[in-house]
Amino acid sequence: MVKRRYSILCVMFAILIGFSSIAFSQQTTYAKEKVTKVTYTTKMKNDKECMIVKGLSSKKKTIWSYKTPYRTCAKCSTFKCIVKKNRVYVFDYLRLLILNKNNGKRLYTVKNTPERGHFATVTNKYNCYEIGYIGNNSGRLYKISPKGKILYKSAKISKYSYGWPSSIKVSGKYVYVGCYKFNGQPKPVTIKFNEKNGKFLGEK
């Protein structure tokens, strides 16, 4: 009788190990699926909006997702998303989140960045340059390091009679910002900054 009970327990234990192995295998396979595409959409609710970012597999299966807090709607977008190599940059109101593209893990959080109307670009070395259209910290050029540190923020471009930034580009030793000049009849111009220190250098 004792041997029979022992045999039954051994069989049950073996079955349990088998099921556990299968479950673990499925979980590992799912976790190892490669993210081939990142999507982002905005969602409205009671005059507020949020952004939902997802990492998808080649079969459009959601590997990970991230949802920002709801923010009050404004005439300029509160959010922006840039995918660069194996990173995802989520510009969310007054902060920047840098995520791992493969698993959605947050790598760095940068606070006190431009509020709305984000114009930004990221280089192959993960240096990020950003300028905001409106709101707190707008009109200042920011350079953010690969490790999520603000290296500099320039003086406001309004100090030099410019405003309403509309584009940004990094080329060689300079950062170029498309904007408008305050001169009665605003006209589109391109101004430039020293890439290393953010010093304003006038029009291109």
PLM regions: where:
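Aromatic (tryptophan-biased) beta-strands that constitute blades/sheets of beta-rich domains
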Residues: T36-Y40, K61-T72, R106-N112, R140, ...
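Short loop/turn segments that connect beta-strands within beta-propeller blades
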Residues: S57-K60, N100-N103, S145-G148, N194-N197
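Recurrent small/Gly-Pro-centered beta-turn motifs in extracellular repeat architectures
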Residues: T39-K43, D92, E130-I134, V177-K181
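Conserved core beta-strand positions within WD40 beta-propeller blades
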Residues: T36-V38, R87, Y126-Y129, Y174-Y176
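Sec-dependent signal peptide cleavage junction
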Residues: F19-E33
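Bacterial N-terminal signal peptides
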Residues: C10-S21
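Repeated scaffold domains used in trafficking and secretory/extracellular systems
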Residues: T28-K32, C73-V83, P114-K125, Y160-S171
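Structural motif
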Residues: D47-I52, L94-L97, N136-Y142, G184-I191
